[in-house]
C-alpha cells in the first residue's frame, strides 16, 4: 500500500506492459481524517497521465470530480515537480485527486515515450498535518479557481463525447 510498482514487475500483469511506456500503479487507502501526498518530477515524455479509481477499478466521475491529471492540466511546482494530494476535502491545491466518497482504490502513473521512468514518492498522514507537510511555496488554488477548473474539465468532456 502507498508504494508504486511498475506493471511489468507484477507477475500477473506481464502482458499489460505498455509498449513505449512504463505504467506504475499504487493501491491507496485514505480514511476521512487522513491525506496522501504523491510527489515526483515528471520526465520529458511524449505524454504522461495520472489515473485514479476505486477499489473496484471503476473510474470516478471525471465529469464532475477531479479524478485524473495529465501533462496538459496538471500544475507543476516552481521546481518542476508534481505535487498531488488525495484527501476527502478540497485542500486548496491545484492537483487534488478527489476520492469521491471511496476510502481505497488505485492510482496509476503512465509515462509514455519518456526519457526516464521515475517512481512517485507517497506519504500518508493525518489531514491536520497537511499544511506543515507541504513545501513552503506550494501552489494554491482559491475556491473560485477550483470552480473554474471543474468547469473547464466538464467542457473537455462535452467536447470529447458531445454530451
Language-model segments: residues:
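A compositional/structural signature for long, glycine/proline-rich flexible linkers
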Residues: 1-163
Amino acid at each position: 500500500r502507498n508504494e508504486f510498482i511498475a506493471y511489468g514487475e507484477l507477475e500477473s500483469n506481464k502482458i499489460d506492459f505498455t509498449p513505449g511506456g512504463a505504467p506504475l500503479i499504487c493501491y491507496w487507502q485514505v480514511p476521512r481524517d487522513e491525506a496522501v501526498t504523491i510527489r515526483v518530477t515528471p520526465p520529458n515524455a511524449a505524454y504522461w497521465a495520472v489515473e485514479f479509481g476505486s477499489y473496484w477499478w471503476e473510474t470516478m466521475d471525471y465529469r464532475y470530480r477531479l479524478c485524473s491529471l495529465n501533462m496538459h492540466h496538471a500544475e507543476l511546482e516552481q521546481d518542476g515537480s508534481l505535487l498531488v494530494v488525495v484527501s476527502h476535502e478540497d485542500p486548496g491545491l491545484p492537483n487534488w485527486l478527489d476520492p469521491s466518497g471511496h476510502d481505497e482504490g488505485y492510482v496509476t502513473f503512465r509515462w509514455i515515450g519518456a526519457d526516464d521512468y521515475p517512481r512517485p514518492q507517497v506519504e500518508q498522514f493525518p489531514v491536520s498535518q497537511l499544511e506543515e507537510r507541504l513545501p513552503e511555496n506550494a501552489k494554491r488554488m482559491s475556491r473560485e479557481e477550483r470552480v473554474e477548473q471543474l468547469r473547464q474539465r466538464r467542457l473537455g468532456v462535452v467536447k470529447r463525447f458531445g454530451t
